A protein has these predicted regions:
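Glycan-processing catalytic domains of CAZymes
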Residues: 1-277
Length: 277
């Protein structure tokens, strides 16, 4: 893709076998059994997101440090959660270095996160994740999807890679972004939402140019009886990393990712034995 000039994604996901991406369990004090289940032998977990307090928090949390250490010892990548929706690209595109409106620049658009955020703030959080929890990479939640935001996102990812050697970067778009993002992150979350939408979802044609290890699907509200169907959809659409749960978002009132699915043993056995293939 000739318009891309940033740091390319790594090739670590090229031969990735089907497995699980854990988008964010509750704090280890509230979900100690769930965190422990991720380290059980044979659990096909690709990575788990650590979100201490809407970020790394203001001081090291010993419970999170212990949970992260156990995951790493079990061979599971630990990713620090960063809110990428507050990367305010219009702040840079629409102002001068002095912060004055650039002549002819459009009026700033409010970001989805409810306010601007300079890159240094995001990097400060990332550095705390590295220093306190020794994370293996980062999960950029609510990552932008438009081409206009690609440059700033690529800039942020490049800085993150400088903070952590061999950092694994997952871009949590939640939908198919502009194809240029595939050259930015190691994995892209191209679906995040309810089963009622996933079962009728379509895949973007450009994803066929990349191996399944580059894509992830996160689906809540999947009934136990439709688990095999969900896994077939992921295989057909070319996503090697998945997270399916029967938990729901309660109409937007509950985080469906905070607890384990009721069929945890079933999904581990299905993916671990290659049922989806």
């Amino acid at each position: 893709m000739p318009y891309l000039t940033g740091t390319p994604a790594t090739t670590a996901c090229t031969d990735l076998r089907p497995g699980l991406g854990i988008p964010g369990l509750a704090h280890p004090l509230l979900a100690s059994a769930e965190w422990g289940a991720l380290t059980r032998p044979g659990a096909p977990v690709h990575w788990a997101v650590l979100n201490v307090a809407d970020g790394p928090g203001t001081q090291p949390d010993p419970h999170c440090l212990e949970a992260a250490g156990r995951l790493r010892n079990a061979g599971v990548r630990v990713l620090g959660h960063l809110d990428a929706s507050r990367l305010d690209t219009t702040r840079l595109l629409g102002t001068t270095r002095l912060g004055l409106p650039r002549l002819g620049a459009p009026a700033p658009r409010p970001s989805r996160g409810g306010g601007g955020r300079i890159l240094s703030d995001l990097m400060s959080e990332a550095q705390r994740y590295v220093d306190w929890y020794r994370v293996d990479g980062f999960y950029l939640d609510r990552c932008p999807v438009e081409r206009a935001d690609l440059h700033e996102t690529r800039r942020a990812v490049g800085t993150l890679r400088a903070l952590r050697d061999k950092a694994h970067i997952v871009l949590g778009h939640g939908t198919h972004p502009h194809p240029g993002y595939a050259e930015c992150g190691d994995q892209l979350v191209t679906f995040s939402g309810p089963w009622s939408e996933y079962r009728w979802s379509q895949v973007a044609e450009w994803t066929a140019d990349y191996p399944p290890g580059r894509f992830c699907h996160l689906v809540h509200g999947v009934p136990r009886g439709h688990l095999d169907e969900a896994m077939r959809i992921a295989r057909w659409q070319g996503a090697a990393t998945v997270w399916f749960t029967d938990r729901t978002d309660g109409g937007g009132r509950v985080d469906p990712w905070e607890s384990m699915p009721g069929y945890w043993d079933d999904i581990v056995s299905r993916i671990g034995t290659g049922v989806s293939e």
